[in-house]
Design a protein with these regions (language model features):
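NTP-handling and nucleic-acid-processing catalytic cores
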Residues: 1-225
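The substrate-binding groove and active-site-proximal loops of carbohydrate-active enzymes
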Residues: 196-198, 232-237
Length: 237
């Protein structure tokens, strides 16, 4: 009781490895971490999060929608997305181009050092006026440059809204949470992806740490068998 009175005992959550097959959590010692990690080629997804154009988005005088391009190797965590993390001192750019699938005009934000991974150099300042679906080379041009810290606080529309991940559900679990915003942290790099990290605090130690620091809330939409919970539409079960 003395430990409790002194504030040394408290209830909280932490991120732990979990085995759906065994139906139990596993310690890092049981898994011999970090020795269990190995480099493998895996499928990744680049996801477009639609920015809300209000006073918190410091990019002004841009026609059309603006999207944050985020990269993930765990697309099954996207329904639990609560934030986007950028590097505070990384250089980012706003690029005007076309969506290669819908062929509609679009403005996207990503890290400047990674532009060449998504856009061909010969397409820079290309022919926007005559672009159409049959044109192989996407025209693009940089409209603005800024630091990651300039994006902090910008808001975006929830990617996959459903009955199970409403704001009310999130705030029921974590009262006062303010999800769906851009936050900053030093763990973000420009080695892979877009320089914008999809952040789901329930899945991953870094995500949980920055989520707690920035009051994103927490949302676990996978059950103990590794299946999506009810309320996620076609994804459930």
């Amino acid at each position: 009781s003395e430990l409790y009175k002194k504030g040394y005992l408290y209830e909280s959550v932490s991120i732990q490895p979990y085995s759906p097959a065994a139906g139990t959590g596993l310690s890092s010692h049981e898994l011999n971490q970090p020795g269990t990690y190995k480099d493998v080629k895996d499928t990744s997804a680049t996801v477009m999060f639609k920015a809300i154009k209000n006073e918190k988005l410091k990019i002004k005088n841009v026609e059309g929608d603006v999207f944050f391009m985020a990269w993930t190797t765990t697309p099954w965590t996207l329904p639990s997305n609560l934030g986007l993390t950028v590097g505070p001192n990384i250089d980012y750019v706003l690029v005007q181009t076309f969506n290669p699938y819908t062929h509609l005009p679009v403005n996207v934000i990503l890290a400047k050092p990674l532009v060449s991974k998504y856009f061909k150099a010969e397409g820079e300042n290309g022919d926007f006026e005559n672009y159409e679906a049959s044109v192989k080379l996407l025209p693009w041009k940089i409209l603005a440059e800024f630091k990651g810290k300039d994006l902090e606080g910008a808001q975006y529309k929830q990617l996959l809204p459903s009955e199970a991940n409403t704001l009310e559900k999130i705030q029921e679990i974590t009262p006062g949470a303010t999800p769906f915003k851009v936050i900053t942290d030093s763990f973000v790099t420009t080695e892979d992806g877009t320089g914008i990290v999809h952040t789901a605090p329930a899945f991953g130690a870094d995500d949980f740490k920055v989520g707690k620091k920035n009051n994103l809330g927490i949302l676990t939409l996978v059950d103990r068998e590794g299946k999506f919970v009810d309320g996620l539409g076609e994804f459930s079960g």
